[in-house]
């Protein structure tokens, strides 16, 4: 393999990552139903498709940073970013779309709502308080699961389509 072909392959890889970042940032900025975003789908896609471990974690986190710079940051962002990195890690381990989506969404639900319970004064710091927090978050979990499946299949089938046509190989 020549240097030129290796360089071009890396360029395609970077182009795919950049397009993914732009798409994610765009979808987080437009009005959408609560928790109906492509962030976990991007994380699952990056975990399965990007061979470089660090890159598969940096792509979804970078996209979040870009869109959060516009939307605004809050005190619990580090936990959300950690949950996103863990989603990519899960996808790398399972390497199947459906299992990765369900596992990532469940982990994201458990981590982020535990954070809500810990940081919020809305719930008593007791077993009943954490159960109430998780119970009230169930509708959001449904939207997270639905959007992650929806966007995951768009990403994976879009990638399969793009890599199957000759035009992609000339980019």
Regions found by a protein language model. Give the residues of each.
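Hydrophobic transmembrane alpha-helices
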Residues: 2-48, 55
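Mature catalytic domains of secreted/periplasmic carbohydrate-active enzymes
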Residues: 3, 11, 49-54, 59-62, ...
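Hydrophobic alpha-helical transmembrane segments
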Residues: 14-19, 54-58, 78-82, 98-103, ...
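Alpha-helical transmembrane segments of multi-pass membrane proteins
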Residues: 20, 40-44, 80-88, 149-152
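Central hydrophobic cores of alpha-helical transmembrane segments
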Residues: 20-21, 56-67, 99-109, 171
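Structural signal for the C-terminal ends of transmembrane alpha-helices
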Residues: 26-27, 46-51, 89-95, 158-166
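Interfacial aromatic-anchored transmembrane helix boundaries in multi-pass membrane proteins
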Residues: 26-37, 61-93
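Membrane-embedded alpha-helical hairpins and interfacial helices in multi-pass inner-membrane proteins
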Residues: 97-171
């Amino acid at each position: 393999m020549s240097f030129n072909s290796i360089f071009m392959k890396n360029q395609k890889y970077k182009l795919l990552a950049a397009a993914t970042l732009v798409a994610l940032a765009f979808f987080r900025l437009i009005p959408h139903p609560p928790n109906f975003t492509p962030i976990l789908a991007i994380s699952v896609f990056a975990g399965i498709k990007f061979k470089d471990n660090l890159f598969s974690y940096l792509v979804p986190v970078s996209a979040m940073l870009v869109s959060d710079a516009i939307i605004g940051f809050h005190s619990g962002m580090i936990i959300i970013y950690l949950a996103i990195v863990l989603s990519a890690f899960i996808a790398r381990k399972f390497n199947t779309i459906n299992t990765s989506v369900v596992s990532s969404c469940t982990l994201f639900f458990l981590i982020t709502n535990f954070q809500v319970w810990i940081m919020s004064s809305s719930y008593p710091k007791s077993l009943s308080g954490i159960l109430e927090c998780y119970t009230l978050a169930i509708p959001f979990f449904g939207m997270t699961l639905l959007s992650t499946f929806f966007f995951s299949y768009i990403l994976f089938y879009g990638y399969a389509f793009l890599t199957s046509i000759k035009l992609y190989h000339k980019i």
